[in-house]
Amino acid sequence: VCPHAVVRPVIMTNEEKAQILKSLDVDKMAIVDFTKDVMNMSANDFCVNILLNELHAKCICVGIDYRFGHKKEGGIEFLKSFCARNSIELQVIETKIFGEANRKVSSQWLRDLLQEGDMDTYLKLTNERPYQVSGVVSHGKRLGRKLGFPTINLIPQEIKTIPRFGVYATRVSIEGDANYYYGVTNVGQRPTVDTIKSHPEETVETFVFDYEGDCYDKNVRVDFIKFLRPESKFDGLIQLKEAVEKDKEKAALVHGIKM
């Protein structure tokens, strides 16, 4: 059961979660709209109305710190009692501890790492599952193509946690193509070319190595592997092009490929 994000940005959208669950051979995913009625629902009503009567749950799997229901009234002890009364199996996942400081792995820590651009630690905490941005490729200004490095442009969903603005070595998968491609991605507001806008939109622009196809209007997923540098404002397009060439070289080294 995946409530929609209403309070804080999400690391994965419901669509991205669905793709991961599909790869694990999960048959169905139920998305509960996080309305005011659901937000004010008691823990018992949620278990009875949603888990039992609607989903006919046979097994419930939650983290050890899981809280639910109005004002977070429900927890593990409540679930143990409810599951015992209704012959439902309950699996409680223990907290994962990481590092010498024995810090608890949490979604907030992962968000903090993304905003710091620390993909190295992020990958360690997620068992090497990269942060990703996915969506349909939009038609941009084609400025990259004019400068000699055409890019795939994605507009992240508003509910999505955006990593630190900057340049990353990335991996790209394209709808209808079984191959993975290596890339170099800029996340940010394109300060060199969008200086006139008072509130420039956040974009994810990716140059893909060794790809000649047309992926406009196709679904694309970009996996973030390593942070290379912060986003910068350059004096002009010539300086921007020179910086991109250096970014491509750095990304190629990360990927272990030759340009």
Set out the residue ranges of the language-model regions.
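N-terminal Rossmann-like or analogous alpha/beta NTP/dinucleotide-binding catalytic cores
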Residues: 1-86
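An acidic, carboxylate-rich microenvironment
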Residues: 16, 45, 78, 109, ...
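A non-catalytic, amphipathic alpha-helix used as a structural packing/dimerization or gating element
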Residues: 16, 121-128, 239-250
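Residue-level signal for inorganic ion chemistry
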Residues: 21, 60, 122, 170, ...
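General small-molecule cofactor/ligand-binding pocket signal
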Residues: 29-31, 89-93, 223
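Hydrophobic pocket-lining residues within nucleotide cofactor-binding pockets
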Residues: 34, 95, 228
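Glycine-rich, Lys/Arg-enriched anion-binding loops that position phosphate/diphosphate groups
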Residues: 83-189
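Phosphate/ribose-recognition catalytic cores of enzymes acting on nucleotide-derived substrates
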Residues: 139-259
